[in-house]
UniProtKB/Swiss-Prot annotation:
HAMAP family: Glutaminase
Alphabetized PANTHER family for the sequence: GLUTAMINASE, GLUTAMINASE 1
Residues noted as binding substrate in the record, renumbered to the chain: 66, 117, 161, 168, 192, 244, 262
Species of origin: Shigella flexneri
This protein's name: Glutaminase 1
């Protein structure tokens, strides 16, 4: 049994130590994100037996952004299976920025990872759907199943993103021209942008992590969301590419599968035990929450979790 007092103490200590840490800045290339109050901070744990521990602004709803890639990858694995995902999308880190087109050029237009923009747009196109609206509704539904029914599209975030996503449109056309997009290019880009524009809070983000930790069963709803056999593929991708250019550093220092988003959220999974999540808008140069990384790492260290430990 996990000690409830110890878990609450871990999140309290992480929040107290790092919630006012200086450094980083909000993502400024998306107008909505630039205007989120930079002093916000939160950290939460959701365990596989459904207990919740949190500190800070844990009810504040923020843009899911790139963490949505985890949900869409999960749905693609359910739809077409792990071999097809690896064949059509790839399963390797790029070693390049998350929105880079260089990796596409170096590999004949094929994306390498579903957790960077090119691979994520391709993954969105891989979802079984007859049209854009069905594709979008299926992706929104998997987000809600994994994290909570309150996850919903923000029209304000979506509008802010749709008017500035020229780079992603270019990526979509490159994928399409190389034969690695499985629906209309602008449909894929539009739905991808929408999936990044949903709002979530820190407890819901930790619930997403706990659902993965529990082998695909949401510990708050007790409903199976994913096949257990698909979860290890998601966690492997998170370990390799979840924090972009910081992924290797994260694996070395923290040793947990993780995923960040430029909305300031960050997620880590302790398989079989819990999800840990944090939120704070200021980002490092790779697009990861400065305080969020510190808070999640602190919780993991205090509790002694690292998948590489014997």
């Amino acid at each position: 049994m996990l000690d409830a007092n110890k878990l609450q103490q871990a999140v309290d200590q992480a929040y107290t130590q790092f919630h006012s840490l200086n450094g980083g800045q909000n993502a400024d290339y998306i107008p909505f994100l630039a205007n989120v109050p930079g002093q916000l901070a939160a950290v939460a744990i959701v365990t596989c037996d459904g207990n919740v521990y949190s500190a800070g602004d844990s009810d504040y709803r923020f843009a899911l952004e790139s963490i949505s890639k985890v949900c869409t990858l999960a749905l693609a694995l359910e739809d077409v299976g792990p071999q097809a995902v690896q064949d059509k999308i790839g399963a390797d880190p790029t070693g390049l920025p998350f929105n880079s087109v260089i990796a596409l050029e170096l590999h004949g237009g094929k994306p390498l990872s579903p957790l960077v923009n090119a691979g994520a747009i391709a993954t969105t196109s891989l979802i079984n759907a007859e049209n854009a609206e069905q594709r979008w509704q299926r992706i929104l539904h998997i987000q809600q199943q994994l994290a909570g029914e309150q996850v919903a599209l923000s029209d304000e975030v979506n509008q802010s993103e749709q008017t500035t996503n020229f780079h992603n449109r270019a990526i979509a056309w490159l994928l399409y021209s190389a034969g690695y997009l499985y629906c209309d290019a602008m449909e894929a880009c539009d739905v991808y942008t929408r999936q990044c524009s949903t709002l979530i809070n820190t407890v819901e983000l930790a619930t997403l992590g706990a659902t993965l930790a529990a082998g695909g069963v949401n510990p708050l709803t007790h409903k199976r969301v994913l096949q257990a056999d698909n979860v290890p593929y998601i966690l492997a991708e998170m370990m390799m590419e979840g924090l972009y250019g910081r992924s290797g550093d994260w694996a070395y220092r923290v040793g947990l599968p993780g995923k960040s988003g430029v909305g300031g959220g960050i997620l880590a999974v302790v398989p079989g035990v819990m999800g840990i999540a944090a939120f704070s808008p200021p980002l490092d140069e790779e697009g990861n929450s400065v305080r969020g990384q510190k808070m999640v790492a602190s919780v993991a260290k205090q509790l002694g979790y690292n998948v590489f430990k014997g």
